[in-house]
Amino acid sequence: MRFGWLEVAALTAASVANAQVFDNSHGNNQELAFSPPFYPSPWADGQGEWADAHRRAVEIVSQMTLAEKVNLTTGTGWEMDRCVGQTGSVPRLGINWGLCGQDSPLGIRFSDLNSAFPAGTNVAATWDKTLAYLRGKAMGEEFNDKGVDILLGPAAGPLGKYPDGGRIWEGFSPDPALTGVLFAETIKGIQDAGVIATAKHYILNEQEHFRQVGEAQGYGYNITETISSNVDDKTMHELYLWPFADAVRAGVGAVMCSYNQINNSYGCQNSQTLNKLLKAELGFQGFVMSDWSAHHSGVGAALAGLDMSMPGDISFDDGLSFWGTNLTVSVLNGTVPAWRVDDMAVRIMTAYYKVGRDRLRIPPNFSSWTRDEYGWEHSAVSEGAWTKVNDFVNVQRSHSQIIREIGAASTVLLKNTGALPLTGKEVKVGVLGEDAGSNPWGANGCPDRGCDNGTLAMAWGSGTANFPYLVTPEQAIQREVISNGGNVFAVTDNGALSQMADVASQSSVSLVFVNADSGEGFISVDGNEGDRKNLTLWKNGEAVIDTVVSHCNNTIVVIHSVGPVLIDRWYDNPNVTAIIWAGLPGQESGNSLVDVLYGRVNPSAKTPFTWGKTRESYGAPLLTEPNNGNGAPQDDFNEGVFIDYRHFDKRNETPIYEFGHGLSYTTFGYSHLRVQALNSSSSAYVPTSGETKPAPTYGEIGSAADYLYPEGLKRITKFIYPWLNSTDLEDSSDDPNYGWEDSEYIPEGARDGSPQPLLKAGGAPGGNPTLYQDLVRVSATITNTGNVAGYEVPQLYVSLGGPNEPRVVLRKFDRIFLAPGEQKVWTTTLNRRDLANWDVEAQDWVITKYPKKVHVGSSSRKLPLRAPLPRVY
């Protein structure tokens, strides 16, 4: 397998040999940001709830040969098995087919008879932990029923630094606390269904431009390395790492490392982010898998903490791999210590046992590569058996109910001057805009939803699923109006402005539908290369609104979008009587919307991002042109922790609609704030100390002769195997750089299996256990002061007090139901992490001595209750 994998590793080692101070300037004469090295890669120890699964993993891995361990770590290649990623198998020990990994965070990609769930951003708009869990559970059930072992989701990267970032909709919200809670609940739901969840994309994967070299070159950008996201230590901990800590604390089984570089070290071979932050500090017990083709070196990635290579080949279907045979070679010749591969296998099998795959597992009953019933066993090369590859198993169960419920619960009522809810007595209803109707090519007519035709219920890319059906707004509204004896007139061509004007002038209410789309960078739609070119509405949307508003004084605007759009030119027009953001609601789109429009569901959703007046209101623009010659484009996160509402607050800029805003058909009041310290001597912060045990090894390595290709094996072209062609390791590797001295490419300490010091901020999954001790109890009385029953989302923000801190940061929230006139006392607690800052010198969390305050209300800028926090440490 000819590839200079040692050479790549050497370059990686050299790039991290000397940690340097973060530098924001670039150019041929300027130093770039560097990522400090951290070695060796921590070995899993089965802490806490992982103990039993870890014990079982050790038992089975101890029986494995080196080749069998390697088989678990390496995918067999793109389109070589049924799933988008599938490892080798270990049939001798009962793992009769490889572990199947499959997209996506909102449903099963490349499949059929599955559900299409609301996107992550819609879940964030519900602010509902239970709904997040139930969605995760339902998705997990569907993946399990299709024979999938590893669900490639949910996502908290991108977090949302850029409002126009292409994949922000796959995640939840630019707020780390809101994202972290819903991220964790989704993971719990998926794994309670018996499927391994994957927290992705780790980390700082905030834009699509320049994420992959080949992709960027295809768009005409002359770069040779992927983008580097350059961030300081404080921002990393307090913003971007925060939700991943919640994921690890929730027991996530897998973490997917990202395409981008972090401080000029690739995400899947970055020892600082994988070894130190994820495994040593956060105590992650599961396995790290690469994003597809994000694996850039063999030895370098192995020593830096990567545990699984996906899809196994270097480029799709090239038959080459950094691992597979090469990983077997590297262990046999001592380049990679045996304990490192043992740890990879143990981590994979620990996650496998943790979620119960040994009890629930069935073979994949679908093919990602064809909808035909029969096909080649190995699709990429048309080899193996011609066999049944699709069993057409319907896995939808009754999940349409939770999809519809989340769709309605995530529908944000941004403005309402009394137009909503509709009474059902409207005689003439206009439904205007392409976004109300069907895609003329069919709901799944564009591969990976890579177009913007008809209503937008899902964005584009690998984070998608096939719709089993799609209820459009036009269909649902028409059914509702007709059942009420009314008339409905629809114009769904955005170029038919004169026809829209005619309908609007005759309608008692005009419902206008507009959208804005985005997605993954491998698809460009209308010149949007994944990321959006701007924040304007798509397909003449502004002109559609202008036309209708000028002819109808009761215009309701419904926005389906991946994130914020610019609404400043029309939102305050008196003829715009209501504005709804419906996000990406999935297959029940129209039904969910009608439930809210007609008052069957009282809206309770809150916007999970800020609506600014201009794109400039959000701060730093996307990096859309290379700024480092043909080297890695440098994306400096100079705004630090100040993104979204934190940025608006810092600039004292008033948004159109603030983070957390959302109206209801009733009203709520807040009163009687109470704050009580809970700290005692037993709750004092205790930095973790001590050291690990030595790196364990399991089983014997054997010799090269033990790992020759088995006699009689019919080798599949380009399939990634763990075996050797020859007992001559150099010949088996077929690497032109084989034989380099270790000192040329092995970082210092990378193979040290002796006991290692524990980090002060570590000690358990999620970080130091005392970070999660409750220090303060806060309560407030919430009253439904209106005439309609409904849910309210109380939000608690903290002012951390420091001179360079955000004005407020969200820390707690809930969603509570109140009948008209009913009062409830909402009680929550603040733990040490909620009140702490990351100290870059101490490398630990500290509660500063600056005075702190707590604020409670209905949004980030409607906080009627506030009080000083007692001093706790």
Curated annotation (Swiss-Prot):
GO terms for cellular component: extracellular region. It catalyses: Hydrolysis of terminal, non-reducing beta-D-glucosyl residues with release of beta-D-glucose. Keywords: Carbohydrate metabolism, Cellulose degradation, Glycoprotein, Glycosidase, Hydrolase, Polysaccharide degradation, Secreted, Signal. Its EC number is 3.2.1.21. The active site is at 291. Pfam families: Fn3-like, Glyco_hydro_3, Glyco_hydro_3_C. It is found in: Secreted. Residues 731-764 are annotated as: Disordered. The keyword Hydrolase applies. Belongs to the glycosyl hydrolase 3 family. Beta-glucosidases are one of a number of cellulolytic enzymes involved in the degradation of cellulosic biomass. Catalyzes the last step releasing glucose from the inhibitory cellobiose. This is Probable beta-glucosidase A. The lineage of its organism: Eukaryota, Fungi, Dikarya, Ascomycota, Pezizomycotina.
